[in-house]
């Protein structure tokens, strides 16, 4: 079977650059034999930077590029010349990318906006040259400050799609059919469970040039929050939706029970999901007459806007758009920042195994050769970097 192009989970080894060393150069000129120290400062090591890019919507471009390394700062030189800063390594990621420490599960950062930049790992600061250490009693210091060490970390990048409306339902509930009917998205549609194996996004056009984004999430089954079916892999994409459209087919044995099972799966995965506004759509309603709709109406969940629709015949689609637009524009339904919690280490290891990301990514590298300007023997004098 062909490998999916939708990648929403990768593990990457990141390493910032180390700072360049300060120079110990002594000024030696024809008419200035005792010119004193003139060693320059070392350059800053390169940062590891994450940048949001709306042109990406998966992490596929990172799947086969698992090592991100910034350049080292160059050493200072004579005439108090600063060393060149190391090149930053910029990692382009889709908006909605969350980053965790792969070893501890600690939450690190969240990139949500196009062009947003986050420094994941800072490069080491350059060391001070010997010109900084000249004093009244120490006219020719033969030492300089070493550059600050680099930082390295293996991280997990996890994508949570940004959409206004998330479609929630069991397999074959008609989610993909609805998305294809009201947007230009063309998800695969077939009459068997789990036709949709990855999320699909569609832009739904509304009146007066207005629009909103809808996400078709692969079908949930009872026990998905414990890993059954497609498991919790795609449940995280619902976290960023400001409104959830629950879809239950009209031929379901018990519409209310099916809705409550879906609700319970979301509650188990993340209780905060229940704070989102919900709308219930009874799909495939072209098989119902008005009398049957009237009989079903009293059995539906209270306090949840509901509508009978058919994506094939167009029944209720226009009204559904009105309901969704109205709910989306309520102040209480604006997308809020997600509270990201650290991952449990034990569950993290199992998660990495399930996602096929349990391979070690440590990187072997060679130390740079010593490129000092002179051959003087000196000892580094460690400085308190925090007070520099």
UniProtKB/Swiss-Prot annotation:
One of its GO terms (biological process) is ribosome biogenesis. Residues 4-162 form the Obg domain. GTP binds at residues 169-176, 194-198, 216-219, 283-286, 310-312. GO terms for cellular component: cytoplasm. Mg(2+) binds at residues 176, 196. Residues 352-388 are annotated as: Disordered. Pfam families: GTP1_OBG, MMR_HSR1. GO terms for molecular function: GTP binding; GTPase activity; magnesium ion binding. InterPro entries: G_OBG, GTP-bd, GTP-bd_Obg/CgtA, GTP1-OBG_CS, GTP1_OBG_dom, GTP1_OBG_dom_sf, OBG_GTPase, P-loop_NTPase. Residues 356-388 have a biased composition (Acidic residues). Keywords: Cytoplasm, GTP-binding, Hydrolase, Magnesium, Metal-binding, Nucleotide-binding. Residues 163-329 form the OBG-type G domain. PANTHER family: DEVELOPMENTALLY REGULATED GTP-BINDING PROTEIN-RELATED (PTHR11702), MITOCHONDRIAL RIBOSOME-ASSOCIATED GTPASE 2 (PTHR11702:SF31). An essential GTPase which binds GTP, GDP and possibly (p)ppGpp with moderate affinity, with high nucleotide exchange rates and a fairly low GTP hydrolysis rate. Plays a role in control of the cell cycle, stress response, ribosome biogenesis and in those bacteria that undergo differentiation, in morphogenesis control. Belongs to the TRAFAC class OBG-HflX-like GTPase superfamily. OBG GTPase family. This is GTPase Obg. It comes from Bacteroides thetaiotaomicron (strain ATCC 29148 / DSM 2079 / JCM 5827 / CCUG 10774 / NCTC 10582 / VPI-5482 / E50). The gene is obg.
